[in-house]
């Protein structure tokens, strides 16, 4: 008799995706981040659901409703901090996942990669709108500054911003719609993640060598399920260390001050995971130019498959490209640091140089390094 998991219409899908899935035998821990992102998403949806039961999306009561969650709701404080720090863990996993894709040439799976970029953008939009909800100073001014960037779009900009605001400034209408979008987007992300997996399973996983592994596959369960459980345990450990010992480490103290349209904070800055893009935005003295650079800093990922000039897929055997990759990582860390600094000398020039380097490495130096390596190998 055939096993029910292989015949039942619903269980068959789960079986083919997580149990009997043929997987390369040599994928490293860098391949753990997909499952970790799934865990992060489930965790965010669950904690978010419980927060939404007590939150009110009204400018008069939003801030006090968050205070009420932390003080009066049973275990409300832990749910709130798990949600806030869960977002940080989500982005750490996202950046690692994208970095893995760049290093090992996973972007040659075009559909999977492009849906991944859409997922990244959707997650960034969700996180931005979530940051507005507590209605602290940084929530209000962050929303004002970032939505105002759209006014740089010629002709329709101002009308577009007022349409998004639902008025002439960030107010009750803005907060209510941001809450609505923040609630619905994670479910759209979950659906997109399924499509992401669907396209991945059409081709099968890449592996560290970048060489087709059809001759050497092993079942996903038990080998990679146990490996994913280890990764999940480490993720939960780091998250709970953050939540229980330093819950405000990655937050901004200004967000404990209720939103006040008459008082601007000394340094308006987004959450740490947006700082690299914020630094690129600030490094260009022109508004429209800055907005374009900001958008391109993420959308440049779409170009990665077309910038791949190497005859090899992975960087595993390409030392010059490896150097370029790690210089890019260092550059992104520099941009993240600069994004959190005030706009003054020497931070301005460092930010401008790091921004130029970012685009230069991706658009010029990495393809050039690949071409040099091809010539060295006489390919």
Curated annotation (Swiss-Prot):
Is Membrane included in the keywords of this UniProt record?
A: yes
Q: Which UniProt keywords are present, listed alphabetically?
A: Electron transport, Heme, Iron, Membrane, Metal-binding, Mitochondrion, Mitochondrion inner membrane, Respiratory chain, Transmembrane, Transmembrane helix, Transport, Ubiquinone
Q: Topology with regard to the membrane?
A: Multi-pass membrane protein
Q: Keyword check for Transport, yes or no.
A: yes
One GO process term, biological-process aspect: mitochondrial electron transport, ubiquinol to cytochrome c
- Transmembrane stretches in the record are 33-53, 77-98, 113-133, 178-198, 226-246, 288-308, 320-340, 347-367
Entry GO terms, CC: mitochondrial inner membrane; respiratory chain complex III
Which cofactor does the UniProt annotation name?
Answer: heme b
Residues that bind a ubiquinone:
201
The entry's free-text remark on the cofactor is: Binds 2 heme b groups non-covalently.
Task: State the compartments where it is located.
Answer: Mitochondrion inner membrane
Top-level division of the source organism's lineage: Eukaryota
Q: Which Pfam families match?
A: Cytochrom_B_C, Cytochrome_B
User: Main site of residence?
Assistant: mitochondrion
A molecular function (GO) term = ubiquinol-cytochrome-c reductase activity
Task: List residues binding heme b b566.
Answer: 97, 196
- Classification via InterPro entries: Cyt_b/b6_C (IPR005798), Cyt_b/b6_C_sf (IPR036150), Cyt_b/b6_N (IPR005797), Cytb/b6-like_sf (IPR027387), Cytochrome_b (IPR030689), Cytochrome_b_C_euk/bac (IPR048260), Cytochrome_b_N_euk/bac (IPR048259), Di-haem_cyt_TM (IPR016174)
Q: Which residues are recorded as binding heme b b562? A: 83, 182
Further information in the entry reads:
Heme 1 (or BL or b562) is low-potential and absorbs at about 562 nm, and heme 2 (or BH or b566) is high-potential and absorbs at about 566 nm.
Q: How does it assemble?
A: The cytochrome bc1 complex contains 11 subunits: 3 respiratory subunits (MT-CYB, CYC1 and UQCRFS1), 2 core proteins (UQCRC1 and UQCRC2) and 6 low-molecular weight proteins (UQCRH/QCR6, UQCRB/QCR7, UQCRQ/QCR8, UQCR10/QCR9, UQCR11/QCR10 and a cleavage product of UQCRFS1). This cytochrome bc1 complex then forms a dimer.
Similarity comment text for this entry: Belongs to the cytochrome b family.
Physiological role: Component of the ubiquinol-cytochrome c reductase complex (complex III or cytochrome b-c1 complex) that is part of the mitochondrial respiratory chain. The b-c1 complex mediates electron transfer from ubiquinol to cytochrome c. Contributes to the generation of a proton gradient across the mitochondrial membrane that is then used for ATP synthesis.
The entry's protein name is Cytochrome b
**Record gene name:** MT-CYB
């Amino acid at each position: 008799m055939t096993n029910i998991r292989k015949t039942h219409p619903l269980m068959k899908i789960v079986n083919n995706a997580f149990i009997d899935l043929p997987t390369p035998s040599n994928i490293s821990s860098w391949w753990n981040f997909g499952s970790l992102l799934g865990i992060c998403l489930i965790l965010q949806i669950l904690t978010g659901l419980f927060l939404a039961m007590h939150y009110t999306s009204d400018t008069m009561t939003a801030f006090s409703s968050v205070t009420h969650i932390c003080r009066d709701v049973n275990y409300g404080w832990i749910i709130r901090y798990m949600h806030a720090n869960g977002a940080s863990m989500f982005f750490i996993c996202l950046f690692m996942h994208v970095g893995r894709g760049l290093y090992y040439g996973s972007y040659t799976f075009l559909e999977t990669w492009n849906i991944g970029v859409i997922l990244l953008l959707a997650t960034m939009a969700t996180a931005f709108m979530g940051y507005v909800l507590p209605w602290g100073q940084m929530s209000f001014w962050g929303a004002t500054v970032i939505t105002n960037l759209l006014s740089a779009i010629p002709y329709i900009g101002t009308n577009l911003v007022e349409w998004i605001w639902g008025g002439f400034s960030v107010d009750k209408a803005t907060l209510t719609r941001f809450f609505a979008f923040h609630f619905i987007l994670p479910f759209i992300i979950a659906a997109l993640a399924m499509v992401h997996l669907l396209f991945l399973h059409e081709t099968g996983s890449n592996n560290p060598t970048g060489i087709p592994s059809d001759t050497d596959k092993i079942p996903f369960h038990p080998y990679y399920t146990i490996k994913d459980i280890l990764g999940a345990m480490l993720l939960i450990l780091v998250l709970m260390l953050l939540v229980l010992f330093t819950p405000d480490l990655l937050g901004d103290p200004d967000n404990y001050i209720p939103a006040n349209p008459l008082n601007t904070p000394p340094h308006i800055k987004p959450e740490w995971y947006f700082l690299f893009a914020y630094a690129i935005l600030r490094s260009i003295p022109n508004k429209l130019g800055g907005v374009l650079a900001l958008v391109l800093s993420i959308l440049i990922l779409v170009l990665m498959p077309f910038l791949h000039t190497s005859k090899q897929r992975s960087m595993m055997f390409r030392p010059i490209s490896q150097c370029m990759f790690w210089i890019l990582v260092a550059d992104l860390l520099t941009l993240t640091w600069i994004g959190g600094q005030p706009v003054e000398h020497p931070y301005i020039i460092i930010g401008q140089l790091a921004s130029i380097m970012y685009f230069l490495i991706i658009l010029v130096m990495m393809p050039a390094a690949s071409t040099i390596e091809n010539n060295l190998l006489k390919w």
